[in-house]
């Protein structure tokens, strides 16, 4: 009887220890950064032509099989704001609250667009790099090669080890922003048309 009692206590003790050892997978202990990709439903671009002042919103729905067509005119300048949504709720503030843990990379694989980050202090990281929630685009050539798709691949990275606002030529286009490490919080694809 003592052995059964002793074994039961031992098994219960081990189960208790194992249950304490297991924790849920959370990328950060900071509650301000609870922004898992599964909770982002839309990535919106608010594109405002500087010449007209008229904004147009392009809505990429996460996991969609179709991409919004962003109409850009060669020679025009646009102010662009990225807005992240979770259903009807604006999740952009959560990214600003955890700005040191986020960074946007803009990839224009078949366009000649000069991008400048224009974030204010609310979305500028502690290392001085701007997250990229607000940008200015100067469109030199929206579609460089008409026989190939032109698009924007916009990626939000979480907890990158290093970031840079530098640009690099990539194939027939330009990538704005580089990073090492981290995870993808969201990726949105937009077709570029003119």
Language-model segments: what does each one mean?
Residues 27-30, 91-131:
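Extended, polar beta-sheet/loop recognition surfaces of beta-rich domains
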Residues 168-194:
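Short beta-strand elements
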Residues 1-12:
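Bacterial N-terminal signal peptides that target proteins for export
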Residues 47-73:
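N-terminal edge beta-strand
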Residues 2-3, 17-45:
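Bacterial Sec-dependent N-terminal signal peptides
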Residues 34, 67-76, 143-144:
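Short, solvent-exposed beta-strand/turn "edge" segments of beta-rich domains on protein surfaces
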Residues 79, 84, 144-173:
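Internal, hydrophobic beta-strand segments that form the core of beta-sheet-rich folds
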Residues 60-66, 118-144:
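A beta-strand/beta-hairpin structural motif
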């Amino acid at each position: 009887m003592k052995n059964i009692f002793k074994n039961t206590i031992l098994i219960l003790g081990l189960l208790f220890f194992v249950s304490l050892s297991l924790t849920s997978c959370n990328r950060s202990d900071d509650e301000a950064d609870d922004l898992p990709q599964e909770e982002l439903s839309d990535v919106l671009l608010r594109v405002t032509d500087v010449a007209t002042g008229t904004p147009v919103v392009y809505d990429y729905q996460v996991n969609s099989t179709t991409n919004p067509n962003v109409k850009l005119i060669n020679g025009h300048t646009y102010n662009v704001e990225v807005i992240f949504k979770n259903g009807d709720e604006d999740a952009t503030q959560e990214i600003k609250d955890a700005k040191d843990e986020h960074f946007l990379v803009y990839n224009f694989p078949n366009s000649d667009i000069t991008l400048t980050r224009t974030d204010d202090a609310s979305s500028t990281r502690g290392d001085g790099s701007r997250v990229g929630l607000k940008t200015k685009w100067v469109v030199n050539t929206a579609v460089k090669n008409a026989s190939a798709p032109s698009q924007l691949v916009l990626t939000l990275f979480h907890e990158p080890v290093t970031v840079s606002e530098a640009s690099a030529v990539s194939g027939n286009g330009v990538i704005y922003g580089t990073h090492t490490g981290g995870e993808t919080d969201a990726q949105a694809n937009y077709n570029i048309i003119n």
